[in-house]
Every structure is written in C-alpha cells, then in structure tokens.
C-alpha cells in the first residue's frame, strides 16, 4: 500500500520525502506536510520557477510506470501478477532527472500521480474522480492523458468521460475570471503504439471526439459558439510497447522527456515536438504558497463549495503576504527594537531624549531591507493583494519609524534650542569679558545658521526617498520658528541687560550731577574762595531748573546710547520704543531716589547750616569775618538766617522757576507703547500723575518735603543758627577784655627799686637776656619738653644717690650702726647708677644670669 511514501499521518522524514508525498489520501484528506516536502526538495524557494504536471488515465494502464521512467520518480506500480489498485488518492514527487535525450529538462518539475479512473474499488462512485480532476486542473499546467492506441476512438476506454469532466470543471473554474483566460495543455501519451495508424490520424480522431464532447456540454451565456481550442492546447506523443519493445520504449521515453522544458507557441507542429511548458499554462502560484493554495482549493472542492480560483488566489496571497510580512518584520525588529528601547529608557529615567547616532541610516537600511525581502517573496502573488499588503507593511514599518524619527527630531529640537541658547549666551559673556566689543545680532545670526544646519543635516539623514512623511519640512519650520522665539527672548534679555547698564550709568551720572547742584546749597560764599567753580550760583531759586536740565541732558544721552546699541541687536522699533519708555520711567525714579537721599534730615540740615555759616561768617567777597563789638551781628545773623530759611520752601517742591509748576512729567515719559507686555511692568514703580490707578497726583509726586518735615527742619535749623549766633557774640565780647591802666601805674611804683637794681647790674641784664634767648630758642625748637624730662630724671637720680650715701654713712659709722643695729657693710661695694630710657625714666634691669 505504498507504505514507503510519506503518507498522511506519518511523521515526515527525509527518506520518505525522497520517494514523494501523498497529497490527498483515499479518504479525501489533504496532507498538511506538503510544504515541508517542498521545502525539503528546495522547490519552495523557487518562486515561479517550477512546473506542475498531472497524469490521468484508467486504472492499471501504467501511469505510475510511465512517470517513473519519464521523471525518475518512484511511484508504486502494479505487480504484473496482480490486477489491483496501486495509486490511491493523489501523489506528488519531484522530477529526479536533470536531462533527457541529451537536452536539459525544466527546473523543479512536480509530478502528480492521480488515482486511476474506472477502478473496481470505487465502482460507480465517480465523486473522487470529479474532485481529483477539478483539483488537478486548478493546480496543474499540463494534464497527461495516458491511453492505449487501441482505446483511441472509444468513449470509456479513451477516458472521454474523464475528459468531459475536465472540460466541465474548466468552465466552472476559469470562465468565472474571463480576464485571465487561463489555458491548459492536454498531453495525450499513446501507449503500445504499433505505427500502423499514423499519429496524425490518431490526433484527428481524438480532436474530433473531444470537439463532440465540448459541443455536448452546457456553456455559459455568450460562449455557446466557443471552441475547445479557445481554452485548451493539445500535444501528442506515442510510445512503443514496454514489454515487447523495451529498448525502443526507453528510447522514446527519453525523447519524450526532452519535451518537458520551456516552449514557445509557434506552429501546429508544436503539438508533436518542442517544449510543453508555456508561460500561459502556469497558474502563477509561488512555490512557497503552493501548499496553502492547494489546501484551500481542496477544502473548497471536498466540501462541495463553489470553487472560485481567483478568490483562492487572493486568499492565498493574503495568507502568504501576512506570513512573509511577519517573517521580514523579525529582521526589522532586530534593528529598530534596541533603538526604541533606548528612547523609552531615557524617558523612564527622566533623562532628556538623546539624539541617537546614525539613526537615519539604520532606519532607512532596515526599512529597505525589509520591504525588498517582502517584494522578493510576495510580489509573485496576486498583484492586488500584494500591493495592498505591501502598503500595510510599509504602514507598519513607517508607523514605528515615524514615532522613532519624531522622537529623534524632538530630541534634536530640544538639544538644538539648548545649544543655541548656550552658544549665544557664551558668546555674549566672552564679548563682555573682552571689553564689550561684540555685536549681538551677528552672534545670533551665526549661531542660528549653525544650529539650523545641524538640525537640517539630522532631518535629511532621516529622510526616506519617496516617503512623504519623512519630509520633515514642517518640523524644520517649527524648529526655525522656535529659534526665532528664543532669539527674541535672548534679544529681550540682552536689551534688559543693556537697559540695566544704561540705568546704572544714569544713576551714576545723576549721583554726580544732582549731588553737585545740592552741594551748591552749602555755599553762600562768593569770590575766588567759593567751593564750586570759583563762583556761587547766581541765584538759589533756579535749583530745580538746574536739576531738571541736568536730568534731561543725562536721559537724552542715555536714550541715544540705548537706541544705538539696540540697533546692533536688530531690535524692532516697537522693542526700542518700549525700552526707551522704561528707561525714562526708571530714570525718573532714580532722580527721585537721589533727591530723597540729598534731602535726608542729616544731609539737608548740614547743607542749610553750611549755607547759613557761609553767609554769616563770610562777607560778600568770601573773606572770613572777625567779629568786633562795633559789628552789626544781629543784622547779619537775621539776614543770613532768613536767606537760608528761604531755601526750605524751595526744597519742599520740585518746581521750575519760570512756570512755578512741576515739570511736565507725563510729556517727558510719554504714552505707554502698545508693545508693552505685563512682564515689562513688573519691576516698574508707580509714578504720580502717570499711573492714575495708583491714586497719586503729579503734585504729590513732585513734593519733596512734607509739611511736618519742613516744620521740624525749620525748628532744628533755628536752634543750630542760634548756637552759631551765640558763639559769634561771645567771640566779639571776648576780644574787648584788657588790663586796666592803673595796674601798670601800681606795678611801676611798687617795682621801681627792683627795676633800678637790674638796670644798674649789667650781669643780671646779660643773664636775663641769655636765659630769655635760650628759652625762646628751646621753645622754637620744641626742646622745652625734653629738657624738663632730663631735669626731672637728673633730680630723681640725685635723690637716689643721696639715699645711697646716707645708707653708706649709717653702715660705716660705728656709733650710728650701733644705735640703729645695722650690720657692717662689706668692703669694696660700689654705688650703682640707674640706666635711664629716652624719656628719663628708669630702664628695666637686664639680668646677666642667662649668659652663664
């Protein structure tokens, strides 16, 4: 029972595959191991480069024997001593011969040995006969009809019933898809050919019988007049008797084998010679999908369903394309999955997404390799299904690549923005360290071009030719837009820093200029001795005019500096306008703060005192006054005091002398520009008369000293002025104190005798002159102090020496010693002298014990 073949239910082995495989068993079950056999025999990888042949004929007519000799197969054959069925179901084996009759045979020829018809085992049951014919016609290019010469002209003997079935199922299968116009080759192999009847005559008989059968079958509408030649080609070959002419039989079989190669439709002689495999015979089922296709066809046949081959081809294409897609995606995953994991890991760890190196080349390479592998294997299937599945595969690949690439561009976007910001900030800092000689706009333009080029290079590396979504122009535009936003932010920050530098410059200049104007209040002197400029101000009433003019000049210069520097930033006119508006507001606040500093209680009181003292202590020429009793101290005091007190109302309010009104602060600051944003106002202090919502008027804004402060200042100034007046009064009165004249008369009368004694003694006169001159010289040279110290030291030294002499006398005098009970002094003792320092004091004793 053909037990040496790989039958259904048996585990497939290489040895069994060497003998073929039972595709359909006698119970009409399909063998799912067919694909294993095709793989083992290397047919599955051949694509369309294979050919499938089926052989039909009555039972025990030598079909299997013919195939074994023709293709080198090992199908089971009937024993010559028995007459029973040998081939059950449908068997398949690969051609084992490479050439025949010296000519190469076609590659990968698959031969199906179909169970013979008219067998006693099945009897009247023709169901399997019809199903096997339908299966063979749906899968095979060439149908070999094995008949004996003496059966030609018979109906049953020539298998005309089987051929009628073939014609009917042909209409059932292929005429549903009229666009394909699939043809088949009926190859009649006439066995035991004697040669009495020419093969041409046998052909004519067979064609005539076949045409009658074709005319008798029912045809679809519109094909009633069709001919059999419209759907079938015919080929004929004759073989001698195998038993009686074995050598000739083998020679003719060898010649017949040479015809199983690729042929071309040319002439009628094609039926008797030339290759039998024409392109239009091929069912266009790739070898790797043949098993699935055959299984689907048989399932439809065995379940008596309406077999639709185009649908089966589409189903096969869908199955195989899905299978191929899964296979090629494995290689794609090998490349892409690690890259996806790197991005996911970075997100999980909270790290900024890193730009993966060479991602574009890896992604594009994996995509191209995957799609090419799919094309190579799947393009052989149904074109519509293949195109659809290719699109689905590309969609799957592109979905993953797009997510990966988008994350890559997002990382490049973030890294680029950060690098751009750092580069600009670093260049600005370097320029500031180098002395401030840098152009912000040039730095921004250079770094922007560099950053855009890096991003563009990365985006181009991710671009895939012909893939619309990989054209990252929107992302490039978005990146460029954000760089512009960052540039604007950096420019705004730089303008803020510029504004701060200008504000510092304004504060510095205001500190000098305003301090100078207020310092002039401390001088009431004129002439060359006046402290500022050699001349005092013409009038003190124009203090605020001078302050305002100095302020306006400084601010105008600051505005010019700011505007010129802002141009190098390529700042818009609106940004410059906002910056100047902020500068004017900040400058006014700085002026107010400086004025408040100058009018602090201690500062303003000191300036008022200096102003008063200059007017009171100095005359109009700036010469200090020496008070005499005859001077009008009260009048000068009153005038100087009232003049100085007149400064208090002047200092109380910021008013210009010409209009006696505050300066036009709203006009100076100007209307708030339309481009001012909330953040531009965060650090601005409210200004009265400008910011009405603060509820502070311009009059209040320009008030420097409040009423209570003014009164307190006046009281304290008057007390201070009164003290100066009392001091001057005392000075005048102290200058008139002198010795009365009668004192000199009394001194002359009482000291007349002493005067005469001195005058009469020249030595006394000389002594007095010498002592007086020496004293004057010592006084002039500041030697009186040292002389007194030396005298004091000499006196103290004399006292000590006297004490030592007295002690020596008491010790050496017997009477005194006995009286005082003092022991005798050793002889040879010296009287010690003290060492004096530079101030005439005893120096500390230095012991000589350390020298021992």
From Swiss-Prot:
Enzyme class, spelled out: hydrolase
Primary localisation category: endoplasmic reticulum
Family: Belongs to the TRAFAC class dynamin-like GTPase superfamily. GB1/RHD3 GTPase family. RHD3 subfamily.
InterPro entries, A to Z: G_GB1_RHD3_dom, P-loop_NTPase, RHD3/Sey1, Sey1/RHD3-like_3HB
Upper classification of the organism: Eukaryota, Fungi, Dikarya, Ascomycota, Pezizomycotina
Stored HAMAP family: Sey1
Membrane topology: Multi-pass membrane protein
Name assigned to this protein: Protein SEY1
Coiled coil: 475-500
GB1/RHD3-type G domain ranges (all copies): 47-294
Residue intervals passing through the bilayer: 739-759, 763-783
Gene responsible for this protein: SEY1
Assigned keywords, A-Z: Coiled coil, Endoplasmic reticulum, GTP-binding, Hydrolase, Membrane, Nucleotide-binding, Transmembrane, Transmembrane helix
Its job: Cooperates with the reticulon proteins and tubule-shaping DP1 family proteins to generate and maintain the structure of the tubular endoplasmic reticulum network. Has GTPase activity, which is required for its function in ER organization.
GO biological process, one term: endoplasmic reticulum membrane fusion
Natural source organism: Podospora anserina (strain S / ATCC MYA-4624 / DSM 980 / FGSC 10383) (Pleurage anserina)
One CC-aspect GO term: endoplasmic reticulum membrane
């Amino acid at each position: 029972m053909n037990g040496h073949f790989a039958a259904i239910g048996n585990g497939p082995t290489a040895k069994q595959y060497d003998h073929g495989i039972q595709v359909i068993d006698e119970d009409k079950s399909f063998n799912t191991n067919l694909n294993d056999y095709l793989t083992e025999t290397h047919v599955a990888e051949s694509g369309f480069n294979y050919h499938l042949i089926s052989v039909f004929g009555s039972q025990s007519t030598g079909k299997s024997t013919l195939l074994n000799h023709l293709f080198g197969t090992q199908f089971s054959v009937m024993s010559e001593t028995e007459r029973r069925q040998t081939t059950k179901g449908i068997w398949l084996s690969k051609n084992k011969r490479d050439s025949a009759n010296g000519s190469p045979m076609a590659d990968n020829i698959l031969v199906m040995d179909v169970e013979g018809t008219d067998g006693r085992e099945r009897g009247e049951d023709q169901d399997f006969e019809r199903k096997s014919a339908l299966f063979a016609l749906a899968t095979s290019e060439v149908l070999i009809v094995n008949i004996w010469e003496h059966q030609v002209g018979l109906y049953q003997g020539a298998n005309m019933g089987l051929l009628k079935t073939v014609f009917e199922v042909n209409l059932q299968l292929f005429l549903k898809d009229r666009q394909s116009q699939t043809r088949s080759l009926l190859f009649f192999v006439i066995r035991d050919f004697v040669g009495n009847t020419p093969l041409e005559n046998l052909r004519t008989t067979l064609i005539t019988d076949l045409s009658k059968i074709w005319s008798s079958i029912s045809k679809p509408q519109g094909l009633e007049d069709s001919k059999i030649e419209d759907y079938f080609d015919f080929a004929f070959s004759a073989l001698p008797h195998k038993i009686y002419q074995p050598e000739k039989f083998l020679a003719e079989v060898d010649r017949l084998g040479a015809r199983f190669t690729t042929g071309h439709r040319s002439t009628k002689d094609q039926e008797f010679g030339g290759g039998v495999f024409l392109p239009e015979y091929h069912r266009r089922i790739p070898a790797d999908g043949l098993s699935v296709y055959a299984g689907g066809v048989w399932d439809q046949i065995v379940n008596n369903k309406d077999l639709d081959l185009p649908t089966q081809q589409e189903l096969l294409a869908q199955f195989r394309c899905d299978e191929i897609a899964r296979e090629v995606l494995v290689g794609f995953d090998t490349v892409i999955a690690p890259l996806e994991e790197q991005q996911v890991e970075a997100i999980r760890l909270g790290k900024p997404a890193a730009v993966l190196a060479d991602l574009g080349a890896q992604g594009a390479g994996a995509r191209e390799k995957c799609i090419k592998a799919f094309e190579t294997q799947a393009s052989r299937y149904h074109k519509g299904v293949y195109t659809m599945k290719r699109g689905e595969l590309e969609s799957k690949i592109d979905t993953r690549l797009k997510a990966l690439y988008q994350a890559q561009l997002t990382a490049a976007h973030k890294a680029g923005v950060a690098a751009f910001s750092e580069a600009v900030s670093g260049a600005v800092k370097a320029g500031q360290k180098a002395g401030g000689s840098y152009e912000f706009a040039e730095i921004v333009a250079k770094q922007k071009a560099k950053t855009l080029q890096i991003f563009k290079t990365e985006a181009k590396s991710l671009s895939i030719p012909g893939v619309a979504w990989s054209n990252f122009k929107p992302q490039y535009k978005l990146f460029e837009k954000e760089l512009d936003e960052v540039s604007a932010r950096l420019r705004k920050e730089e303008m803020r820093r510029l504004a701060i530098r200008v504000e510092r410059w304004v504060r510095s200049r205001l500190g000098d200029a305003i301090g100078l104007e207020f310092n002039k209040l401390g001088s009431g002197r004129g002439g060359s001795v006046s402290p500022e400029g050699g001349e005092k101000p013409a009038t003190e009433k124009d203090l605020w005019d001078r302050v305002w003019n100095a302020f306006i000049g400084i601010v105008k210069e600051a505005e010019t500096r700011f505007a010129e520097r802002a141009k190098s930033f390529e700042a818009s006119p609106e940004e410059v306008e906002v910056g100047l508006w902020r500068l004017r507001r900040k400058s006014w606040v700085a002026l107010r703060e400086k004025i408040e500093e100058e009018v602090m209680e201690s500062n303003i009181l000191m300036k008022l005192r200096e102003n008063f003292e200059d007017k009171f202590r100095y005359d109009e020429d700036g010469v200090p006054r020496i008070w005499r009793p005859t001077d009008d101290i009260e009048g000068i005091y009153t005038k100087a005091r009232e003049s100085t007190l007149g400064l208090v109302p002047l200092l109380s309010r910021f008013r210009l002398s010409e209009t006696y009104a505050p300066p036009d602060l709203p006009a100076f600051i100007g209307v708030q520009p339309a481009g001012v944003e909330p953040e531009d106002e965060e650090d601005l202090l409210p200004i009265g008369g400008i910011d009405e919502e603060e509820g502070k008027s311009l009059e209040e804004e320009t008030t420097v000293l409040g009423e209570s402060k003014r009164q307190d200042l006046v009281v304290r100034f008057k007390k201070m002025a009164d003290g100066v007046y009392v001091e001057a009064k005392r000075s005048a009165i102290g200058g008139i104190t002198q010795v009365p004249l009668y004192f000199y008369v009394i001194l002359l009368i009482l000291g007349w005798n002493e005067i005469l004694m001195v005058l009469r003694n020249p030595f006394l006169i000389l002594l007095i002159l010498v002592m007086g001159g020496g004293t004057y010289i010592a006084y002039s040279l500041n030697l009186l102090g040292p002389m007194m110290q030396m005298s004091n030291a000499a006196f103290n030294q004399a006292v000590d020496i006297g004490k030592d002499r007295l002690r020596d006398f008491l010790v050496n005098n017997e009477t005194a010693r006995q009286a005082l009970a003092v022991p005798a002094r050793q002889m040879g003792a010296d009287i010690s002298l003290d060492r004096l320092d530079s101030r005439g004091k005893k120096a500390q004793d230095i012991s000589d014990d350390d020298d021992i």
